[in-house]
Structures are given as C-alpha cells and as structure tokens.
Regions:
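The conserved acidic donor/metal-binding loop of glycosyltransferases
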Residues: 83-88
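Cell-envelope/extracellular polymer assembly enzymes that use nucleotide-activated donors
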Residues: 3-5, 32, 175
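Conserved small/polar residues in nucleotide/adenosyl-binding loops
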Residues: 189-191
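Short, well-formed alpha-helical segments that are part of the catalytic scaffolds
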Residues: 12-26
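A short, conserved alpha-helix in the catalytic core of glycosyltransferases
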Residues: 159-163, 169-186
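Acceptor/aglycone-binding surface of glycosyltransferases and processive sugar-polymer synthases
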Residues: 59-73, 90-170
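A conserved acidic beta->alpha catalytic loop
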Residues: 37-45
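Short aromatic/hydrophobic "clamp" motif used to bind/position activated sugar donors
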Residues: 79
Length: 191
C-alpha cells in the first residue's frame, strides 16, 4: 500500500502535465504519482511517463469514471487528487496529506474560491452556479465547505474505498462533497 498517492486524471493535458507531475514530485517526494489518461489525443500519457508518473488508462470517457477506477485500483493511506491542467498549487499538498495522515481527516477540500478564481473565470453564470450549489449544500447539511466543486482534494483510505461513485463526469466533485457531509465524514479546508 502506498503511503501517499497523487492521482491526476488527464484529458489532453500535454501542455501542463509535465509541470504538474514535477511540482508534486518536488513537494511530496515520497508519494507515488499516478496519471490516468482518459482518451487523450495528444502526448499526455507519453510526457507523464517520461516525468516518472505511473500512467494508466481509463477508456470510458468522464472524470467520474476515471476517479472510480483510481479508487478501485490504488491502495493508499492518503489520496490526493489534482487536475492535470495546473490549476492547483502543489505547495498545499503536504498540509493536505498531513491532515489525513496525522489528524484523521476523511476529506480535505482545496479552495479555489478564496483566491482570484472568481475574477479570472469569465464563463457566464459559472460563478453564480458555484455559489448557488455551495450555499444550498451547506444549508441542507449544516456545513461550511468553501468550494464544493474543486478538483483538488485529499482523502483517507476509508473514504476512497467506501465512496459509491455514481457520477460519470465533472459532477463527481459535488458528489464527493455531498457524500462527505451526508455520512458525517470529517471534512477540512486546506490552510
């Protein structure tokens, strides 16, 4: 069993995957870095492998399908999931893994929304949708998760192995948040 597994679902990320793998190797040299290629038509898998990542493939399209396979195939005390597009800073990974390994936190949620994310994101209604979903889930479950839809998280072994993934696509992030608060898992935002 790996102590820490960094899981990177990828679809056509040849421009950024090298940096993402290198950054996480630098911050967590003891971790095993896994890149799951989801039918990329570019050189994502080749570049990731050259950087030292363990490359595997999920041929059923969709991020939820990729994460389902990751959690099924990999055994680790701590899982860190990040996107292959270099959205999230690897510098936070150590604190996120320590929360899982040393403080028995089930899920650590990376927070895009406290930074410049809302200012930089120009997609119509995207920010409004994020706020609406976040407020609704936090109200229903009496919680205060800052970023329901982030792709940057850390998980315990128990969470990963008991999470019944139903989503096929990007709705997986919301499903993870709802599962955690519904099952009274210990959830923390990273520092």
């Amino acid at each position: 069993m790996d102590k820490i597994a960094v899981l990177i679902p990828c679809y056509n990320e040849e421009k950024t995957v090298e940096k993402v793998v290198s950054d996480f190797k630098r911050e967590l040299p003891e971790a095993v870095i896994y890149v799951y290629d989801n039918n990329s038509t570019d050189r994502t898998a080749e570049i990731a492998e050259k950087c030292g990542a363990v490359v595997r493939h999920e041929y059923v399209q969709g991020k939820g399908n990729v994460i389902r396979r990751m959690f099924r195939e990999i055994n680790a005390e701590c899982y860190i999931i990040t996107d292959g597009d270099d959205t999230y800073p690897a510098e936070c990974a150590r604190k996120m893994s320590e929360a899982v390994l040393e403080r028995n936190v089930d899920m650590v949620v990376g927070d895009r929304l406290s930074s410049t994310y809302f200012k930089e994101n120009k997609r119509a209604f995207h920010n409004t949708g994020n706020r609406l979903v976040r407020k609704s889930i936090n109200l229903l479950f009496h919680n205060d998760i800052k970023d329901i839809m982030t792709g940057y998280r850390a998980f315990s072994y128990e969470f990963a192995k008991t999470f019944p993934i139903l989503s096929e696509g990007f709705e997986i992030e919301t499903e993870m948040s709802i599962h955690a608060v519904d099952k009274n898992k210990i959830v923390r935002a990273h520092v």
